[in-house]
Amino acid sequence: KRYPASTTKIMTALLTLENVSNLDETVTSEAVDFENVTADSSNAGILLGEQVTVRDLLYALMLPSANEAAYMLARHVGGSWEQFVDMMNERAAELGCTGTHFCNPCGLHEDDHYTTAHDLYLIAKEAMKDVTFRDIVSTVQHRMAKTNLHEERIILTTNQLIFSSFQPWSYANCLGIKTGHTSQAGNCFVGYAEYGDAKLFSVVLGCSSSSKEYPTVAASFTDTKKLCQWGFENFTSKTLARQVEEVTYTKVKLSTDTNQVILTAKNDLVSLLPRELDVKDLELQSDIPEEVDAPIKAGDTIGSVTY
């Protein structure tokens, strides 16, 4: 059980993308969007009565971690931010989160607003399936469109791993996702990185605001980089079974054509495994009936195998 701080906004973005079909529709900020946002908390400078597109609100949410954007999106999607929080908790349960409870859409501290590293991974994994989300969280800077109260403005990411490729703590393999910080939560970061065919998620919570290597950089970033580098150095994607290759077979009854049928994997089965592991050394455990009754056609599911 940990406090997530602004990594909460991954769920806010996910629900917005799942429920809003037109990201160019505008949302007008209201007084309620600022009631729970402290003056010194992260923001995008959105003013009362300002009309901002959902798309720009998502960028404001995920790059500078704007709390007013979180409340605007929550109200727009849920009807009220309180109803939206109910949606957040329902969606978390649907994703298999067992240690998460949200109280607000932005992550500002409340004692009953908590999660776990594994639950954040489940939420982030689902969010990263969305192309727009992936584009947003891998963006360093975004130009928000002119509004009724603002000229164009540029907002910047708080993700120090991608902010500047010239800094020694940057990490070229990092493609997102979200930072977080409160005094109670410490420094938090949900990360995602790719190297070749390998893909890694990382979640670090409660980190120091100063790393050993770089005193001005939070340990959440340097720890994430170390975790991902270790992961890529020691693990790689390996194919356990290919769609067209025989995995096993089973007997067939009541058929005049054959007494057995070849079984193949429904899709290529790929897993992230230790580099030194030989796939041939893995033990195959099958949950397949010894025999099945005809008729059987290509594509029918007969059973499952576990490596």
Locate predicted features.
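Active-site-adjacent loops and short helices of periplasmic peptidoglycan-processing enzymes
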Residues: K1-H118, L122-V131
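Domain-terminus/edge residues, biased toward the C-terminal soluble/receptor-binding domains
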Residues: C97-T98, H109-Y114, H118-Y307
